[in-house]
UniProtKB/Swiss-Prot annotation:
Disruption phenotype: Mutants display an overdeveloped neuromuscular junction (NMJ), with the number of boutons greatly increased. The lineage of its organism: Eukaryota, Metazoa, Ecdysozoa, Arthropoda, Hexapoda. Belongs to the protein kinase superfamily. CMGC Ser/Thr protein kinase family. GSK-3 subfamily. This is Protein kinase shaggy. It comes from Drosophila melanogaster. It is found in: Cytoplasm; Nucleus; Cytoplasm, Cytoskeleton, Microtubule organizing center, Centrosome; Cytoplasm, Cell cortex. Interacts with cos. Residues 434-453 have a biased composition (Gly residues).
């Protein structure tokens, strides 16, 4: 990309930014290491600035958004990721405003932020200091794909549950992420904790306020975006999450496409031609267009024979044409596919560590859809009694401070699902490969931290992790893949059907002010 990097994270309205704290960046050397000291503001709580020193800085990603560095805080030794983006002085930074509101165990934490001067006159950069998490779901899945395997079903269950929980939280605040994809799902392979990252495309959606449709990375774009809708809802994230789940089950993207038209072709090959009412719900402007009639492909034939029935059912509830018909993220957490996580048993991962926190719901989380509480909580927590119990109280909910409630086997589950046996996954981890390139064509994703991936560089697989990951793999969009199903000639017919959509929304994120 030529020229200056884009200004950061969708400038917020026309609101004048408050005067920026430019305290200067000081550097010195100690024991042969370069130490940088900045004047920073904590990510949450007080606005009182403080000096923060860090060292061992190295670039781990860059793209149109800016640059991401890994560094180590001098005071604590904690590794952090510093996302540096060009700041337009005229506007507030939307990503910063949103991240300061968020506090959840499945969302990457903003530790500090500070401003620094650029080389050009009046050039100012915003630096977001984020907790560092070593891997992404994308890189772990790619390592399995190298050996023609998919991530074991129990890890898919664990990762997707945490994603839905993070979405339930941000959607309850009216915030839409708008770029859900495997590259933006940070993963600690030691603890199996998943955290949603990169809020550079996120926006608080307001009823009646138009939004840009040219948003979200191509393989994960909801059909209403392809149709050019500008009044969409947080359900676009739900569609994207359904694409992620399907991709993890298949080992490749379910709807690969080289353009907006190709994308819709792939969707129609699986879901069939949308009805007139479904088109109206996505974008009323297209209801009069004549689409060739293509039958839907049975979901059971889209996936491998041994894919758990409950997983396929969940995908079908997520990938609905009609946005309002898509399941909510919290309802997804309560889906039977995740019941195994709620079973009482050993609370350990294959490496012997405790399961990540799955049921430490806050009162706010349990108040999102109170009717789901009995389905969300494991029976042994619902039955907890006495003042120290973890059962929701009549007036709201106690904080359910439990970690996992079952063990996760890296070889998959042997439990039956609606009468059919779940598969035993072949093997556990991909080889801890070498190689450092790894970027593939597709959505033009940038590497760590921005629209293309997350804040992470890879650090090699840890013992007991679901995958041993190659060092330094660049995070770009997943390449190719054959999509699920569709009969002979379906692609041609669907392409004809989408001819009117043509140049609308070819994919890619982060391009405008809305």
């Amino acid at each position: 990309m030529s020229g200056r990097p884009r200004t950061s994270s969708f400038a917020e309205g026309n609101k004048q930014s408050p005067s920026l704290v430019l305290g200067g960046v000081k550097t010195c050397s100690r024991d042969g290491s370069k130490i940088t000291t900045v004047v920073a503001t904590p990510g949450q709580g007080t606005d009182r600035v403080q000096e923060v020193s860090y060292t061992d800085t190295k670039v781990i990603g860059n793209g149109s958004f800016g640059v991401v560095f890994q560094a180590k805080l001098c005071d604590t030794g904690e590794l952090v990721a510093i996302k540096k983006v060009l700041q337009d002085r005229r506007f507030k930074n939307r990503e910063l405003q949103i991240m300061r509101k968020l506090e959840h165990c499945n969302i990457v934490k903003l530790l500090y932020f500070f401003y620094s001067s650029g080389e050009k006159r009046d050039e100012v950069f915003l630096n977001l200091v984020l907790e560092y998490i070593p891997e992404t779901v994308y890189k772990v899945a790619r390592q399995y794909a190298k050996t023609k395997q998919t991530i074991p079903i129990n890890f898919i269950r664990l990762y997707m549950y945490q994603l839905f929980r993070s979405l339930a939280y941000i959607h309850s605040l009216g915030i839409c992420h708008r770029d859900i994809k495997p590259q933006n799902l940070l993963l600690d392979p030691e603890t199996a904790v998943l955290k949603l990252c990169d809020f550079g495309s996120a926006k608080q959606l307001l009823h009646g306020e138009p939004n840009v449709s040219y948003i979200c990375s191509r393989y994960y774009r909801a059909p209403e975006l392809i149709f050019g809708a500008i009044n969409y809802t947080t359900k676009i994230d739900v569609w994207s999450a359904g694409c992620v789940l399907a991709e993890l089950l298949l080992g490749q993207p379910i709807f690969p496409g080289d353009s907006g038209v190709d994308q819709l072709v792939e969707v129609i090959k699986v879901l069939g031609t949308p009805t007139r009412e479904q088109i109206r719900e996505m974008n009323p402007n297209y209801t009069e267009f004549k689409f060739p009639q293509i039958k839907s492909h049975p979901w059971q034939k889209v996936f491998r024979i041994r894919t758990p029935t409950e997983a396929i059912n969940l995908v079908s509830l997520l990938l609905e044409y009609t946005p309002s018909a898509r399941i909510t993220p919290l309802k997804a957490c309560a889906h039977p596919f995740f019941d195994e996580l709620r079973m009482e048993g050993n609370h350990t991962l294959p490496n012997g560590r405790d399961m990540p926190p799955l049921f430490n719901f806050t009162e706010h989380e349990l108040s999102i859809q109170p009717s789901l509480v009995p389905q969300l909580l494991p029976k042994h927590l619902q039955n907890a009694s006495g003042p120290g119990g973890n059962r929701p109280s009549a007036g709201g909910a106690a904080s359910i401070a439990a970690s996992g409630s079952t063990s996760v086997s890296s070889t998959g589950s042997g439990a039956s699902v609606e009468g059919s046996a779940q598969p035993q996954s072949q093997g556990t981890a991909a080889a801890a490969g070498s190689g450092s390139g790894g970027a593939t064509a597709g959505t033009g994703g940038a590497s760590a931290g921005g629209p293309g991936s997350g804040n992470n560089s890879s650090s090699g697989g840890a013992s007991g992790a679901p995958s041993a990951v190659a060092a330094g793999g660049a995070n770009a969009a997943v390449a190719g893949g054959a999509g699920g199903g569709g009969g002979a000639g379906a692609a041609t017919a669907a392409a004809t059907a989408t001819g009117a959509i043509g140049a609308t929304n070819a994919g890619g994120a982060n391009v405008t002010d809305s």
